[in-house]
């Protein structure tokens, strides 16, 4: 081998080069992990502005109550507006769909109202349970109160209360006397002492039994103890 190349490809130099490459790869991997963490944190805090979106026609219960059979299409349009869905293949049907979104999230639920015509006259109309204008404002307001501000997200405060899970009911242990037939003798209770009863600190003396009194014993006067 050429003496010059022999010095270049020496084991010591190759080891240094290998360690350098491994170090560069490790630093690159760590920086990538840090960048991903920072990006996730920034996306959580600094969210792009998303305007409120109202899709369709808001139909309140007050508007729905004004519909009557026999109305013309123009009268329906004046009350409820131009329908969101008016198919060319279903000219006798107008579909009103309403949905409200705030910050990309749906507030409330999607509601539908359908009006059927025969020519230019209303013959039928149906729809979901519709809120009043006051109820819709309250529904949107409750959603706004559930959202946290920028500072609350940073400080991790003002979280919504978490409902604790329901406690599981206790399992009842079946008694030994539940399945006994009528008139059967009840088994005696276990009166054996426990392990700690063998020690003097926990062993209790049995209660002194009262003397059994026979006939005439209540009239006997106890004798004084002999003095020594």
UniProtKB/Swiss-Prot annotation:
A lipid is attached at residue 30 (N-palmitoyl cysteine). Keywords: Cell outer membrane, Lipoprotein, Membrane, Palmitate, Signal. The keyword Signal applies. It is a lipid-anchor. A lipid is attached at residue 30 (S-diacylglycerol cysteine). Pfam families: BamE. It is found in: Cell outer membrane. Residues 197-228 are annotated as: Disordered. Coiled coil: none annotated. One of its GO terms (molecular function) is protein-macromolecule adaptor activity. Disulfide bonds: none annotated. GO terms for cellular component: Bam protein complex. The keyword Lipoprotein applies. It comes from the Bacteria. HAMAP family: OM_assembly_BamE. Belongs to the BamE family. This is Outer membrane protein assembly factor BamE. It comes from Polynucleobacter necessarius subsp. necessarius (strain STIR1). The gene is bamE.
